A protein has these predicted regions:
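A short, well-structured alpha-helix characteristic of acyl/acetyltransferase catalytic modules
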Residues: 1-5
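Active-site rim helix/loop that mediates acceptor-substrate recognition in acyltransferases
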Residues: 8-35, 44
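Short hydrophobic/aromatic beta-strand element in the GNAT-like acyltransferase core
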Residues: 27-32, 42, 58, 92, ...
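Conserved beta-strand in the GNAT
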Residues: 31, 38-47, 53-60
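Conserved acetyl-CoA-binding loop-helix of GNAT-fold acetyltransferases
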Residues: 61, 67-80
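Conserved short alpha-helix immediately C-terminal to the canonical SAM/SAH-binding motif I
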Residues: 74, 99-102
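Conserved GNAT acetyl-CoA-binding A-motif
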Residues: 75, 81-96
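Conserved catalytic-core motifs of GNAT/GCN5-like acyltransferases
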Residues: 92-94, 104, 109-126
Length: 131
């Protein structure tokens, strides 16, 4: 699934970061399957007790399944879980210029833009959804 979104949404260099993330034990990570039992979307979150925030992490949809509502459902589910578990915590995420508008639909606001952060042509958009 990661590869279907590279290089438009992720840089090739991020694959190892994603793999390392998946072996962590202190995260919540969800996977959506379609009717053929194929993984079509995934994403997680993790609580940062130092600053009382929750990071929305590594959300992605297999590129062959974009525009089918999987990303929306996964994001709604994660935000709902976070607001139930951590009702007084802001939700943070970072994404690119290719997906920040998607997250704006859920109430996330841009706090910072860093040009070419992930790779040449892949800018980082830091976003927050405040409680």
């Amino acid at each position: 699934m990661f590869r279907t979104n590279t290089p438009h949404f992720f840089d090739y260099s991020e694959q190892q970061l994603f793999t390392n993330y998946l072996i962590k034990k202190d995260i919540q990570y969800y996977v959506l399957f379609n009717e053929d039992n194929r993984i079509v979307a995934s994403g997680g979150y993790g609580y940062n007790n130092k600053i009382n925030t929750v990071d929305l992490t590594w959300g992605m949809v297999d590129r062959n399944y974009h525009k089918n509502g999987f990303g929306r459902r996964l994001t709604e589910y994660r935000v709902q879980k976070i607001t139930t578990e951590y009702p007084k915590s802001d939700i943070l995420l970072n994404t690119t210029q290719n997906t920040f508008k998607f997250y704006e639909k859920f109430g996330f606001k841009i706090t910072k833009i860093t040009k070419d952060y992930y790779a040449l042509g892949l800018d980082r958009y830091d976003m927050i959804k405040s409680v």
